[in-house]
Each structure stands twice: as C-alpha cells, then as structure tokens.
Amino acid sequence: MKRKKFIASALLAIPTLSFAGIINFDRKKINTDQGPKKGIVIRADESRFNGKLTKPKDAFLHCKVSSVDTQEGLFIQTSTPKIFERIGGPPPHIHKYEDETIYVVSGEFVVHIEGEDIKVKTGDTAFIPRGTLHTIINPIENNPGTVVVICSPAPKKVEDFFGYISENGSISPDIVPLGWD
C-alpha cells in the first residue's frame, strides 16, 4: 500500500474505532444520575435558573439551559428587553475558565474583543475563547434586541452570577465567579 493511501486509511479509521469504543479520547466521566431524566422544553416566558422552572415577570435575563442540568458543562441564557433599556454594558472582563458565545437573535450590538469594537446584528455570532478580554455593549437606548449567551464549561457560580443580575439588574462584587477578572 502506498504511503498516502495508508495514511488516509488510518485517518478514516479513527472515527469508526472511536464509535466502536476501541479508542477513548479521555472524555470526562459523566454522572448520569444527575440532571433531568428526559429532554425538557423551556418556553419563551420561562426561565430555569438552578434547574427550577419559573415564569419571572420582571427578569433581566432568562436561563434556558441550567448548569445544574448539564453537570456544569453548559449554561445558556437569553436577554429580555429590560436589560437593554440603557446604553452601555458590563466593563471589559476576562473569563479564565469558560468560553463564551454570543448569538444576536435580533437587534444591533457592539462586541468588544481584545481592544476592538465590532458591530454585530441579527444572525451574527461572536465566539470569545477563555482568557480573552471582552464585553458586549448596547448602543441603543431601549434596544428591542435579544441575544443568546452560551458559557462552556459552566460552573454553578457562573449561573448564580447571571441569576443575580437577572433579579437585580446589577453586579455584586461578592458573586463574581473565580477567574473572572
């Protein structure tokens, strides 16, 4: 067998061997006793902070997938119009341990990444790897826009932080997660 064909065959075999359980890529052991026992649906007006379904009327944010549900692997939240009543946003910050993805469902925003301001609009996505200085800025008073924010991994403290903001609309220094500078 020629060298190119051998290498191509070997590379093509990796996914098959992985699915067959012959190759294990050191995945984190997952405790399947925790989290929901079946799929869940969270409606537009619902929130799931701490794995508990609620219908908050005056929330700034809605939790859609709780870190409790994913064993701290993932946290997904959506904004509500209330959070974008004023122009501005949180100060630029760094997450040492979490990647953050921002998806613009509707409206226009500015994502600040490593000193650069980037305008984002409906359908745009910003991926911010851990260790990157960033923030999201609302440039419009009473912005009707909506964003989805995804954090991964998502320690419980991350969800608690956003839960506090959802209820209070502000940030308390004593709830900032470890590694958020």
What spans do the regions from the language model cover?
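Short acidic-glycine-tyrosine-enriched beta hairpin
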Residues: 115-130
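N-terminal export signals
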Residues: 3-26
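A short glycine-rich, His/Asp/Glu-containing loop-to-beta-strand
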Residues: 53-92
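Double-stranded beta-helix
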Residues: 139-181
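C-terminal segment of N-terminal export signals and the immediately downstream linker at the start
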Residues: 20-57
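Short beta-strand His + acidic residue motifs that chelate non-heme Fe in jelly-roll/DSBH
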Residues: 111-112, 128, 134-141, 147-149
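Short, conserved beta-strand element in jelly-roll/cupin
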Residues: 80-82, 94-111
